[in-house]
Structure formats: C-alpha cells, structure tokens
C-alpha cells in the first residue's frame, strides 16, 4: 500500500484560510480535468491540465447510471496520485464530513464538496474550517458562493449542469454572480447590511466582495463545458479558470480535445487560435437539453442560509 501523497497541502503547511486560498490562487488561468483512472490522468497532465479531479465515474455516466453517487474508491485515488505530478482533487458528498476526513488522510490536494455526488446531508454542508486541505464548492449565486466561503471554501466554481455537455447553466450562474456583485458595489453601507441579510451571508464577506469587485477567492467555471469555444465564453465572462469533465473523455478524440481546451484557456481572447484548435477534434460528447432534466444537480444545497 502506498504512503499518502506528500504535497503542498501537508498538515504542517496548511490550516489557515490565507494559505488555503493561496494554494487555490496557484491554479488561476488553468484547466482542471475529471479523470477516472491513471491513463486518463496521464492524458490530462500531458495536455497541460493544472490539476485533475479523481472520480469513480465522469458526470455523464453518473447521470446515465443513476443510483447513489459516492466518493471514489481510495485505491483509485491513490493510483491517480501516484501517476501525475499535478495537484489531485477528489469529491465528497455535500455534508459528508467523514468522506472529507478520509480524503484528507489520503493526501489529496483539494476536496470538492460536490453536488455531482448524491448529497449526504440536506441541511448542512461540511464545516471546512478545521480541515487542512483546501475545499472547492459550487455556487449558482453570490449568496451561495459567500455561504460556502464562510464555511471555509478556498475556491468557488459555478455549478452548471455537469454531465450534460450543455454550457447554458454555467453561463447563467457566472452571469448571476457577476450581476449580484455589481449590485453590491452600488450600495451604501446601510444598504449592504440589508443585502447581506437578504442573501443570508456574513456582512464582512459581502463588504469585501463589493470592495474587490469580485469574489474574495478564486472562481472557476464548471458544468457542461465541451468545446474550446465554451471555455472561451466562460473565461471572457470573467472566471479564473475552468473545470472540464465528461466533455473530454466522452468525446471522439480525448487527447486532441484535451490539448485544445488547454489552449482555449490560455488564448480565450484570440478567435484565430480558437478556430485553429477547434478543427478536427472528432465528435463532441452527446449533449442534453437542461430544461428536460428530471433533476438539476445545481439545485442541491443545504437548506440553511446562515
């Protein structure tokens, strides 16, 4: 049995929010790819991914197969960690602090408390503050984002609708967060107090967000990105990087598409480069219309707002 991975997120170096958010800052301008085995992890790293997300199944297969989706097998996570040198993330269920404790013990670099897996607690998210490993959490709105940050999340991503190959929900969530930040910037101190109560978030976090004009932590896009153009669209909307899951390894040419997606993150403002890297990528993953989904994963959040 291999020893837990020694990484930048070892216990002696982490624990404070400043350190954890600093580790997330190192991923800015990058792409994080979902992988289910060592071979896929190798493809992702060789393509230029800044990190990989270790999963039992990609989101498209989770949707297709149904049932309860849980944390990946620790052996699979360790195999992926032993294969690549880039940071390795892994998902735990919403509210499942025991899964998070196991993942921290394995030595993963980040934990994603994810709505893609079946929620374990419909009233509480994991208290992320005591953990030494940084957490990633999804958000559809400024309120959701700041609630997760108040719980200790060091990185936010749009929820989108993973496994659909349809970017519409990720765009909606990115625009919603941007819109609500602009509203906050226009409010007086007294009005911000009322807005914080309306959103169900700590006043100090809302004040900091209004002053910065952006979330106080790294904000990536996720959920349904399947083409270089999708990546460019979200980057131009102001996110710091992207997660891509089923869109790569459910496509006709994963190796070429992975490299193209990496180029799209770097050259998101250059239509010529985007056109070049978009050529001959093979068939994209088969997409789903989000309005026809029987359940939207993005709606999975604990009921408490404080």
Swiss-Prot record:
Active site (UniProt): 91
GO molecular function: pyridoxal 5'-phosphate synthase (glutamine hydrolysing) activity
UniProt cross-references to Pfam families, sorted A to Z: SOR_SNZ (PF01680)
Catalytic activities: aldehydo-D-ribose 5-phosphate + D-glyceraldehyde 3-phosphate + L-glutamine = pyridoxal 5'-phosphate + L-glutamate + phosphate + 3 H2O + H(+)
Upregulating conditions: By ethylene, a major product of degradation of oceanic dissolved organic carbon by photochemical reactions initiated by sunlight.
Reported function: Catalyzes the formation of pyridoxal 5'-phosphate from ribose 5-phosphate (RBP), glyceraldehyde 3-phosphate (G3P) and ammonia. The ammonia is provided by PDX2. Can also use ribulose 5-phosphate and dihydroxyacetone phosphate as substrates, resulting from enzyme-catalyzed isomerization of RBP and G3P, respectively. Also plays an indirect role in resistance to singlet oxygen-generating photosensitizers.
Designated name of the protein: Pyridoxal 5'-phosphate synthase subunit SNZERR
Organism: Suberites domuncula
Gene name in the database record: SNZERR
